[in-house]
Amino acid sequence: MEPIEQQLTELRTTLRHHEYLYHVMDAPEIPDAEYDRLMRELRELEAQRPDLITPDSPTQRVGAAPLTAFNQIRHEVPMLSLDNVFDEESFLAFNKRVQDRLKSTENVIWCCELKLDGLAVSILYENGVLVSAATRGDGTTGEDITSNVRTIRAIPLKLHGDNIPARLEVRGEVFLPQAGFEKINEDARRTGGKVFANPRNAAAGSLRQLDPRITAKRPLTFFCYGVGILEGGELPDTHLGRLLQFKAWGLPVSDRVTLCDSPQAVLDFYHNVEKDRPTLGFDIDGVVIKVNSLALQEQLGFVARAPRWAVAFKFPAQEQMTFVRDVEFQVGRTGAITPVARLEPVQVAGVLVSNATLHNADEIERLGLRIGDKVVIRRAGDVIPQVVNVVLSERPEETRPIVFPTHCPVCGSDVERVEGEAVTRCTGGLICSAQRKESLKHFVSRRAMDVDGMGDKIIDQLVEREYVHTPADLFRLTAGKLTGLDRMGPKSAQNVVNALEKAKATTFARFLYALGIREVGEATAAGLAAYFGTLEALQAATIDELQKVPDVGIVVATHVFNFFAEESNRDVIGQLLAEGVHWPAPVVINVQEIDSPFAGKTVVLTGSLSQMSRDDAKARLVALGAKVAGSVSKKTDLVIAGEAAGSKLAKAQELGITVIDEAEMIRLLGA
């Protein structure tokens, strides 16, 4: 056997293995970028020796074989995949190939849309009624998932409107919004169920359940992007026109679909979507670019496994492979001990990543991770990089187990793990310098007491030099003492003292949040402040009374009660008040007497506002009798969506909650 034959055989075997893991087992072992690299390598070798191309080569088909647990459906029109480009140069080369094949010098009109990271499905409607649904499978045969697809509320069981074809096969992507993904994993961790690595795996696993009742509990959704069978009817002669027609018939279509009349316009679309990617509320891995004219699509035709008139322009990979060199343990402000993987540095989504969170001991056990392992790292948006899975097939011989500490790595105190919790905590409290540092950093942060100019490095020095032990000590600092810190001159020191003086005037909600009570975020702090009105009333509240606050359950109520029951905490609060920390007296609001469209409503703000600050909006809403919550739930009455609204908007849409924009909010505020 020639060396190139051996190389081709090994590449095909490797790709088939990973196709099986991805398409059939829903348990990919390598990131998409590595699969794409292997596929490109195989194509290049086959281009050198076309006589060695075999019919079963991964380059000659679309996906892996369907599961045998489901009935199979043969696609009357094959479900092809798309070729990929990864940079501007490759896209421009693709654009030129299209123009050359069309023998045209005029710009092509492109229809650009999001490349959703979910599961491709085909849905067949006969006389407007959903009769079957299938996965892509290998492109010619897929799994029958009709019962499961019928449970997805975004997909209509019957189309509405006029001129619906006798047989219409709609193609699109089933996916799981990030809010739904987080909820599924949260429930799984609590019940000991399967935790999914990413939303795509969760969507695929949900859709391939043999019991549709399980699928029905998962908040899957769907966007359509194309057509297969079309009989007994007509569709518009442009891709965008077809999408708009689908929408008119009740099918969900992404609102990020744009016509571009030049290659530069396509590149602008690509970069705008890439910028907005972290706020979409669901995962995408690129944009799809299609010739808009159906006549030109037909003229361009297909290659073996993909159309010539479309391409997927993929973003820089959010997943990459690297090695775990060590694991260290960090201590947070509540004593939580978090394992952090120290990695062989690797570029992920344009950022050099050398650390990744491992969350807790349960996560290490779930991953089966050992020091020295080859792992897949994922970084999405502003999310801290995390280890997705271990590449077990490439585990080195010299790996060693990860041993969780029995004593705090900073102060040496015993660690404990409360039954029912995943987190291990240091019992040292303020004896532990790590907890003191993190508590003080939280206290002065922008959304807490907002002490301008007091950064992490200043806090570290203040604790290490024993200048500060509690938050109250901050307000006793002098410019002279601060001047002794590294890189702190007299002017900078005085600015910090001035900022501390300014921060004394705060709000009750900010003060509560700054105290760092476990499980009390901004929204909960605001809810507690609004409900009790005064610090005295809150300190005197029982656990039962605390649970009367919206969105406060037994766990949060217990943490709040225990915090105020601790004498040292009450002492620190007393010192803070003695140093001059204060806030306005509460304004008693009788909601029943307020004539406002917001009175008595639970409202959630999401996205960025252009006409006023988030705090101003909250204050005005509360003044009109609203309760402003931090998360969307079934109890939410209204969501106000600003620019770049993300997962909260997606969850509101899933739950059918009324959504208004900033302009409508301002109109109602003045009503």
UniProtKB/Swiss-Prot annotation:
Amino acids binding Zn(2+): C408, C411, C426, C432
Binding site for NAD(+): D32, A33, E34, Y35, D36, S81, L82, E113, R136, E173, K290, K314
Domain BRCT span(s) in chain numbering: 593-671
Positions annotated as active site in the UniProt record: K115 (n6-amp-lysine intermediate)
Keywords assigned by UniProt, alphabetized: DNA damage, DNA repair, DNA replication, Ligase, Magnesium, Manganese, Metal-binding, NAD, Zinc
GO terms for cellular component: cytosol
GO molecular function, one term: DNA binding
Cofactor: Mg(2+); Mn(2+)
One Pfam family here: BRCT
PROSITE patterns: BRCT (PS50172), DNA_LIGASE_N1 (PS01055), DNA_LIGASE_N2 (PS01056)
Enzyme Commission number, as recorded: 6.5.1.2
Catalytic reaction list: NAD(+) + (deoxyribonucleotide)n-3'-hydroxyl + 5'-phospho-(deoxyribonucleotide)m = (deoxyribonucleotide)n+m + AMP + beta-nicotinamide D-nucleotide
GO BP terms in the entry: DNA repair; DNA replication
Domain of life: Bacteria
Family statement: Belongs to the NAD-dependent DNA ligase family. LigA subfamily.
Function, in words: DNA ligase that catalyzes the formation of phosphodiester linkages between 5'-phosphoryl and 3'-hydroxyl groups in double-stranded DNA using NAD as a coenzyme and as the energy source for the reaction. It is essential for DNA replication and repair of damaged DNA.
Cross-referenced NCBIfam families: dnlj (TIGR00575), PRK07956.1 (NF005932)
Protein name (Swiss-Prot/TrEMBL): DNA ligase
Source organism of this protein record: Salmonella paratyphi B (strain ATCC BAA-1250 / SPB7)
